A protein has these predicted regions:
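Membrane-interface amphipathic/re-entrant loop segments adjacent to transmembrane helices
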Residues: 28, 33-34, 79, 215, ...
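Short helical patches
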Residues: 32-46, 198-205, 209, 279, ...
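Short amphipathic alpha-helical coupling elements at transmembrane boundaries
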Residues: 45, 60, 75, 105, ...
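Membrane-interface helix/helix-cap signal primarily in integral membrane proteins
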Residues: 1-84
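Generic alpha-helical structural context detector
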Residues: 59-63, 168, 233, 292
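Hydrophobic alpha-helical transmembrane segments in multi-pass membrane proteins
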Residues: 17, 70-253, 281
C-alpha cells in the first residue's frame, strides 16, 4: 500500500489542509527562482509548438516536466520498465554536461574555463528541471567528475556516489526512505560497484579465448556485455522496485538495450530544438525531427 505520509514527509510536506481559505499572501519570492521557472516555461512553449503529439515526452526528457505527458504513454513506459528515461537522470546529465564540456574545450576554452562554465550551467539546469533527488544526485556526481578533471585528479564512481549521497542526506535525511533516492543510488551501485566485479569475472573466463576472437566475436561480446550490464542494474534495483511498486517488468532488461542508445538522440534533438526556437522556429522544427521519429517508433 502506498505510504503517502512517508512520501510527502520526504518532500517536507507534513500537513494537508482541506477547504482552506487564503486570507493573506506573502509578496516576497525568489527572483532568480522565478527566472528559472520562466526559462523552463519558455522552452516548454517552444517544444509544444514544434513537437506536436510528442511534446509531452520531449518536455519530460529535456525539462523534467511531466505535466503534459499522456497518462497512457506514461503507464506504457512504466509497465515496460523504461519509465526512468522520462526522468532527468545521470544519463541525461552525463550526455548534456560532458557534451557541453567537450564543446567548450573545442571552441578554444581551456580545461579550467570550460569546466567551471559547464559546472555552473549544469547546476542551473538541475535547479530549472525541478531539483528532484535523482537530478541532484546526477548533478553532484557530474560536479565531482568535472572538478576532478579541473584539479587533475582521478574520479571514481563509488567515491562520487558516496559524496553525493552525503550531501543530499545532509540537506534532507528523510530522503533515505524515498523510493527515488534508493532507486537512483541503487542504479549507480549496480553499474559502479557490482558490474565491475561481474566484468572482472567475465574477463578472467574469456582471457584464454581473446587471441582467437574475430570481428564477429567482438561484436557478440559487446552485445553480451551490454545485456549483462543492463541485467546487473535491474537485479541490483529489483528489491527496491518490488518494495515500492510490487511489480517488475521482465522485458525491461531487453527493452533497455534498445531504448538507452536512442535516448541521447531524443535528448540532443529536443535540447537543440528548444535552444534554436529562441532564434528561429523553423530551425527548431528541423532539429526535433530525429527525436520525433524515434518517439513515434
Amino acid at each position: 500500500e502506498f505510504d503517502s505520509k512517508a512520501y510527502y514527509g520526504c518532500q517536507r510536506i507534513y500537513y494537508v489542509m482541506k477547504k482552506g481559505k487564503i486570507k493573506k499572501q506573502s509578496q516576497s519570492h525568489s527572483a532568480y527562482g522565478q527566472f528559472l521557472i520562466d526559462v523552463q516555461q519558455k522552452f516548454a512553449g517552444i517544444l509544444e509548438k514544434t513537437c506536436g503529439m510528442e511534446a509531452g515526452a520531449f518536455e519530460a526528457i529535456v525539462l523534467g516536466d511531466k505535466t503534459n505527458l499522456d497518462p497512457e504513454l506514461k503507464m506504457r513506459y512504466q509497465m515496460a520498465g523504461i519509465i526512468h528515461i522520462l526522468a532527468i537522470s545521470g544519463l541525461h546529465i552525463s550526455l548534456l554536461g560532458m557534451g557541453l564540456y567537450n564543446l567548450l574545450k573545442k571552441i578554444g576554452l581551456g580545461i579550467w574555463p570550460a569546466g567551471l562554465l559547464a559546472l555552473v550551467i549544469m547546476l542551473q539546469y538541475g535547479m530549472m528541471t525541478g531539483g528532484s533527488v535523482s537530478t541532484m544526485r546526477a548533478v553532484c556526481m557530474f560536479l565531482l567528475s568535472v572538478g576532478a578533471k579541473i584539479a587533475g585528479r582521478i574520479y571514481d564512481m563509488p567515491t562520487g556516489m558516496a559524496a553525493a549521497a552525503i550531501l543530499i542526506l545532509m540537506e534532507n535525511p528523510a530522503y533515505l526512505l524515498d523510493g527515488g533516492f534508493l532507486l537512483s543510488f541503487g542504479s549507480v551501485i549496480g553499474i559502479g560497484c557490482v558490474w565491475p566485479l561481474v566484468q572482472e569475472g567475465m574477463d578472467v573466463l574469456n582471457r584464454k579465448k581473446r587471441s582467437e576472437v574475430n570481428e564477429k566475436g567482438k561484436i557478440r561480446d559487446k552485445l553480451l556485455m551490454s545485456f549483462l550490464a543492463s541485467g546487473v542494474v535491474q537485479l541490483t534495483t529489483l528489491p527496491i522496485v518490488l518494495w515500492f511498486y510490487g511489480e517488475v517488468s521482465v522485458m525491461g532488461i531487453f527493452l533497455n538495450l534498445l531504448v538507452l542508445p536512442t535516448v541521447g538522440i531524443v535528448l540532443g534533438s529536443g535540447t537543440a530544438g528548444a535552444l534554436l526556437g529562441l532564434v528561429t522556429v523553423r530551425g527548431a522544427f528541423l532539429a526535433v525531427v530525429p527525436g520525433r521519429i524515434i518517439l513515434r517508433g
